[in-house]
UniProtKB/Swiss-Prot annotation:
Biased composition (Polar residues): 1034-1049
Annotated Gene3D superfamilies: Calponin-like domain, Kinesin motor domain
SUPFAM superfamilies from the UniProt entry: Calponin-homology domain, CH-domain, P-loop containing nucleoside triphosphate hydrolases
Gene: KIN14J
Designated name of the protein: Kinesin-like protein KIN-14J
GO biological process: microtubule-based movement
Record flagged with keyword Ribosomal protein: no
Matches recorded under InterPro entries: CH_dom, CH_dom_sf, Kinesin-like_fam, Kinesin_motor_CS, Kinesin_motor_dom, Kinesin_motor_dom_sf, P-loop_NTPase
Regions of compositional bias (Basic and acidic residues) in chain numbering: 158-173, 910-921, 995-1017
Length: 1071
């Protein structure tokens, strides 16, 4: 025994020495290797993290601080575990705290029996436990020991199963239970009682018990709606007791194993001490002891690992026990709630049953009473039926007698019915005959009704022809649609008729007085397009090429769409073109279609009237230049001759010119319109055509007028320059209204001179021209007053009769006569020079000659811009070539523009003026014989204060004799007045003693005037006479009287004064 102890001691000494030597060697050279290994392990861990989660992109040599920053919020740890085992971790929201995520990760590590770390380690502590835990996780998933379902399997109920010998005994329970996993469990009371009586629950595996518990709970919650029977509750309590007993037995076993492990540990420690005491033995013994020590160390490490695993199992079992205890408590609470619910339902059912029983008893008593009452009523009804049957028998006898009495009457009625039937057939036959007769009549009426629309259209055409013959101003009304964003506003338009009726009403007032009816030639509604508006205007446009003068102007308040109708919103789109562009485009198309028969030339002028100033907006100098106006339009329709005339040959030329004009036109912003026209714009198109065969000349003009809108200052909020412009606009439109009023009432005096606008439109409003007015209406309810005022003005305009329009056509004979007149005027000019020389010689006759000169000077005002008579006819014709020079030549040939007056002509006395008035009385009668009505004011002459003003053109006012659009008549009158002037009175003056002339030159100069004016018509001449007009017609167009040969013979060298609408002072300055 002692030898055995000594041997053990020696072995212990060997083990101790070998252990010490091994520890020394570890402290020495192996420390470097361990550092290298730890470094490599750290790098491999970083590499594994980057491979598992590619989005981390950690550096290869990442420090512990970098790893701490990456893993601190717990998201990377949870994502890592989900990546390794999908679905094992429940990911929370982005606002979940980091500590909750880390605790969830640590719980999963505990379930997998892997080393864990504390939350404080990853936040501020040492990172070694964290790295060890991650390395263990890497190793567990790298060697393939965990599959995808390993973590999910660990999350289930993981209590250890009882591996006793009873496994074979409870196989029947397990097989019977597992056979029902795919189907429903038998929940009958008999089955549950058999399970409780048998020992199969106690012998069954723990996992089977938990699965059965889960299925029973699921079945009770889904199929029984929370109602648990008493047998089911007993089964659940038995299952819970068995599970609690097994958990307690497992805990006792773990305690016993811990005690056994501690005993073994003490035993091994004692052996280690003994071996350490025997470590001083021989080398062989040391080797033996060393081997024994290594073996013991291995066993020790194995035992320690087993202890750690058992401790973990204990911890896990404790947690599972706590979890099962919580579930058991929850099940008990649910069971208690189910029992209480069941008891409450039983009480409710018992109460309902008692209530139903009481109600049934009450109904039974009521039924018995009802049966007694019914039997009593049956007896009463039997008695009543017997009495009624007797009564009906008596009535039957009475009715039988009645039927017998009336049977004879019925036979008589049948005979009468037969006769009535024959009468009805005869009447029906007559009705059919009448029906056929009236059908024929109705067919005739229907045929007449079919032709009604044709007759109506013919009446409308005849009405238009009558309007054409009367020369009425056509009025088309166009209603502007609401602007974007204004559809919710109230409108003033109540009704739009097909034949030009328009009814407006004030939406803010009720009653019949608020409705107003207007009648125009045509009314365009809000949906009318530019093309539809132009289609009704096209016949007027085409008449220009036939030699007629046409004027189209737009009238309305500001912002009502006048510029939109006349010009359009844009010239880029052909659909948006206004009347201006479409009219010129149509003119060019017609000229091209007629180019084989008539050669046309088209010229365009564009001026604006801004603040009572006429400006040329197509000239290079812009609108700064002020132009004068001819109140008497020239034969070619030029009302503003000094405005630049541009020859156009295509629509593109017109678009370019009009674009320049619109850019130069004055516009401004007001409260009602962002781009309000602040001036009246007049686009004049002059057409001259020459017939290829007959060489006859056709002259037509088209005036397209875009009037500035009338506006109320309180609504437009105009101030400063805008206010001044608004005042001028309203003043000019008011003057236009006065002219329309005078024309509508056929007043003898029409105030054209009140405004530049009316002077420009004088030839269109006062002459025989075709005139059309577009009246623009704003449908907004706030503009009701302006709308009614505009429509009233348009209604007055529609009643104006201008007379039938006439074509301006010159034949070849007329041109020859005009040339003869020009030659005669040259001869007269030479006679004037001879007469002036004679006056210097005969100074004693100066007084009588002054009187004659004064009388004749008053008749013919001339323009400072015209050629003098002394110029050669060829020179004058050279300046009058083509479209734009012909009008000037005609005016030179037909008007009174002659040589200068003498100095004495401007210093006449009041006696001489009185004598002039008496002297010209015969001239007035002579003019009446010709069909021309010369008033006293027709021979008045007014001039400018400054005769040298080059910016003003001579302006013959409407009180003077004016030239109308009847070109043939006016030219013939001009020729007659030029060739046969009134010279009777001058001859009497010359024959007086104080003014006797004996020179042969004087006799030659007055040789043509010896006959009386009444005998002039008897003189044979090729010049056509002016036709007489009936007295009921409007006042004929008047021609300014040209200075005759005798007047030129008596006039001096001084140029006559000029007249404009802005000055009325005679010119007294000597030359």
């Amino acid at each position: 025994m002692s030898s055995h102890l000594s041997q053990d001691a020696n072995m212990n000494g060997v083990y101790v020495r070998s252990d010490v030597s091994s520890m020394l060697s570890f402290d020495g050279s192996e420390s470097r290797e361990s550092m290298d290994d730890s470094k490599k392990g750290h790098q491999s861990l970083v590499e594994w993290l980057n491979e598992t989660l590619p989005y981390l992109k950690l550096p290869w040599e990442a420090s512990e601080d970098e790893l701490r920053a990456c893993l601190r919020d717990g998201t990377v740890l949870c994502s890592l575990l989900n990546q390794l085992s999908p679905g094992s971790m429940r990911m929370g929201g982005s606002f979940e705290p980091a500590s909750v995520k880390i605790e969830r990760f640590l719980t999963a590590m505990d379930e997998m029996a892997l080393p864990r770390f504390e939350v404080s380690d990853i936040e501020q502590g040492d990172m070694v436990p964290v790295l060890q835990s991650l390395k263990a996780l890497k190793a567990s998933f790298s060697d393939g020991s965990y599959d995808k379902n390993s973590l999910a399997a660990r999350r289930r109920w993981s209590l250890p199963e009882d591996h006793s010998d009873s496994r074979g005994d409870d196989r029947n329970f397990t097989d019977g239970f597992q056979s029902k996993e795919g189907s429903e469990i038998d929940m009958s009371d008999a089955k549950i009682s058999d399970l409780l009586k048998s020992n199969s629950l106690r012998n069954a595996p723990t996992r089977s018990l938990f699965d059965m518990l889960d299925k029973l709970l699921d079945e009770s919650m889904t199929k029984m709606n929370g109602h648990v029977s008493h047998a089911m509750a007993s089964l659940l309590s038995a299952l819970v007791q068995v599970i609690e007993q097994r958990i307690s037995n497992q805990a006792d076993n773990l305690k016993n194993q811990n005690i056994l492990f501690r005993v073994r540990e003490e035993k091994y420690r004692s052996r280690i001490k003994v071996l350490e005491s025997l470590a001083a033995g021989t080398t062989k013994e040391n080797e033996i002891v060393t081997n024994c020590m290594e073996h013991i160390k291995l066993e020790k490490t194995r035992i320690e690992e087993k202890e750690r695993s058992e401790e973990k199992d204990v911890v896990r079992l404790r947690k599972e026990k706590e979890r099962s205890d919580a579930e058991i408590r929850q099940l008990k609470q649910e069971l208690k709630l189910v029992k209480e619910t069941h008891e409450n339902q039983c009480l409710e059912l018992e109460a309902k049953a008692q209530k139903t029983r009481d109600e049934l008893e009450k109904k039974l008593k009521d039924a018995e009473l009802h049966v007694v009452d019914s039997s009593r009523k049956v007896k009463e009804l039997e008695k009543l039926c017997q009495s009624k049957s007797q009564r009906w028998e008596k009535k039957e006898c009475i009715y039988q007698n009645f039927i017998d009495n009336h049977s004879g009457a019925l036979q008589e009625l049948s005979a009468t019915s037969l006769s009535i039937k024959h009468e009805v057939v005869r009447t029906q036959r007559k009705y059919f005959e009448d029906l056929n007769y009236y059908g024929l009549k109705l067919k005739g009426v229907a045929d007449a009704a079919k032709n009604y629309h044709v007759v109506l259209e013919e009446n409308r055409r005849l009405y238009n022809e009558v309007q054409e013959l009367k020369g009425n101003i056509r009025v088309y009304c166009r209603i502007r649609p609401f602007l974007p964003g204004q559809n919710s506003r109230q409108t003033t338009i109540e009704y739009i008729g097909e034949t030009g009726e328009l009814v407006v009403a004030n939406p803010f007032k009720q009653g019949k007085d608020t409705h107003r009816l207007f009648k125009f030639n045509k009314v365009f509604d809000q949906a009318a397009t530019q093309e539809e508006v132009f289609l009704d205007t096209r016949p007027l446009i085409r008449s220009i090429l036939d030699g007629y003068n046409v004027c189209i102007f737009a009238y309305g308040q500001t912002g009502s769409g006048k510029t939109y109708t006349m010009s359009g919103p844009s010239i880029t789109s052909k659909e948006d073109w206004g009347v201006n562009y479409r009219a010129l485009n149509d003119l060019f198309l017609l000229t091209q279609s007629r180019q084989n028969t008539v050669m046309y030339e088209v010229g365009v002028q564009m001026v604006e009237i801004y603040n009572e100033q006429v400006r040329d907006i197509l000239s290079d100098g812009g609108s700064s230049r002020r132009l004068g106006i001819w109140n008497t339009a020239l034969p070619n329709g030029l009302a503003v001759p000094d405005a630049s005339m541009h020859c156009v040959r295509s629509t593109e030329d017109v678009l370019e010119l009009m674009n320049i004009g619109l850019m130069n036109r004055t516009v401004g912003a007001t409260a009602l319109n962002e781009r309000s026209s602040r001036s009246h714009c007049v686009l004049s198109v002059h057409v001259r055509g020459v017939d290829v065969e007959t060489d006859s000349i056709l002259r037509g003009s088209l005036h397209l007028v875009d009037l500035a809108g009338s506006e109320r200052v309180d609504r437009s909020e105009a101030t400063g320059e805008r206010l001044k412009e608004a005042q001028h606009i309203n003043k000019s439109l008011s003057a236009l209204g006065d002219v329309i009023f005078a024309l509508a009432h056929k007043n003898p005096h029409v105030p054209y001179r009140n405004s530049k606008l009316t002077q420009v439109l004088q030839s269109s409003l006062g002459g025989q021209a075709k005139t059309l007015m577009f009246v623009q209406v704003n449908p907004d309810g706030d503009s009701y007053a302006e709308t009614v005022s505009t429509l009233k003005f348009a209604e007055r305009v529609s009643g104006v009769e201008l007379g039938a329009a006439k074509s301006s056509k010159e034949g070849r004979d007329v041109r020859q006569l005009m040339e003869q007149v020009s030659n005669l005027k040259d001869v007269i000019a030479k006679k004037d020079e001879e007469l002036q020389n004679f006056q210097k010689v005969k100074g004693n006759n100066a007084t009588s000659l002054k009187r004659g000169l004064s009388n004749l000077r008053l008749v013919g005002p001339t323009s400072p811009r015209r050629h003098s008579i002394g110029a050669s006819p060829n020179a004058r014709r050279g300046k009058a070539s083509g479209l734009f020079g012909r009008g000037t030549s005609d005016v030179d040939n037909c008007s009174e523009y002659s040589s200068k007056h003498s100095d004495s002509g401007s210093q006449q006395s009041s006696d001489e003026r009185k004598h002039q008035k008496d002297y010209h009385q015969p001239s007035k009668f002579a003019g009446a014989a010709k069909g021309i009505d010369f008033d006293d004011e027709d021979v008045e002459l007014v001039g400018l204060a400054d005769a040298d003003s080059e910016d003003r053109l001579s302006d013959i006012s409407d009180s003077c004799l004016s030239m109308g659009t009847e070109t043939d008549g006016s030219i013939s009158s001009a020729v007659e007045l030029t060739l046969f002037p009134e010279t009777a009175k001058p001859l009497e003056l010359i024959e007086r003693p104080e003014a006797r002339m004996t020179s042969e030159k004087l006799e030659k100069s007055v040789k043509m005037g010896k006959t009386e004016p009444k005998d002039r018509t008897n003189i044979p001449s090729k010049i056509p006479k002016q036709t007489l007009k009936p007295p009921g017609q409007t006042r004929p167009s008047r021609l300014s009287i040209a200075t005759s040969s005798s007047s030129k013979a008596l006039t001096g060298a001084k140029r006559p004064t000029i007249s404009t609408s802005s000055s009325a002072k005679p010119l007294n300055r000597r030359r």
